[in-house]
């Protein structure tokens, strides 16, 4: 799905987590920064339309330089807290990546590097109220349309929702 599914899941989970209190804006995969308003793969805005958080999502192998580049973008946008989320099947040098994030954190730019599975577990655990598969499916489709996701990605979401009887 050319790296589209992970950002869609993250955007949908963030939307559910914030319950409308913040605006979650996913960007077309591999095009973050294409506009002066885009910082990460997913940007989060408060009700005053101020950027308050940004998330980089990697669903392919990455290096400490990728993490450093993301944190540098976040710093330039004056975002002090951010997330770098990686997919289930990616490879990276854990020590180097976490050390890089820690060093930049000491300079005031905090970026949590976390797996998609841990991110989803953490967010779902901290939400008050039930989240239904139906809500998640509708959000995935809504965000897929927003980023002009490939037809295969949209079909996969629809297939999964059919399998769950939605």
Regions found by a protein language model. Name each.
Residues 4, 8, 12-166:
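Catalytic core segments in nucleotide and nucleic-acid processing enzymes
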């Amino acid at each position: 799905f050319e790296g589209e599914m992970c950002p869609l899941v993250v955007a949908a989970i963030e939307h559910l987590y914030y319950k409308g209190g913040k605006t979650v804006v996913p960007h077309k995969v591999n095009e973050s920064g294409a506009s002066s308003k885009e910082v990460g793969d997913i940007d989060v805005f408060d009700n005053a339309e101020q950027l308050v958080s940004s998330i980089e999502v990697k669903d392919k192998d990455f290096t400490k330089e990728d993490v450093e580049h993301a944190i540098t973008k976040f710093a330039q946008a004056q975002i002090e807290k951010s997330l770098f989320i990686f997919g289930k099947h990616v490879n990276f040098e854990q020590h180097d990546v976490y050390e890089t994030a820690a060093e930049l954190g000491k300079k005031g730019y905090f970026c949590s590097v976390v797996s998609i599975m841990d991110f989803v577990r953490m967010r779902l655990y901290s939400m008050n109220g039930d989240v239904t598969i139906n809500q998640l499916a509708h959000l995935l489709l809504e965000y897929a349309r927003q980023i002009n996701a490939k037809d295969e990605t949209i079909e996969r979401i629809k297939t999964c929702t059919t399998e769950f009887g939605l």
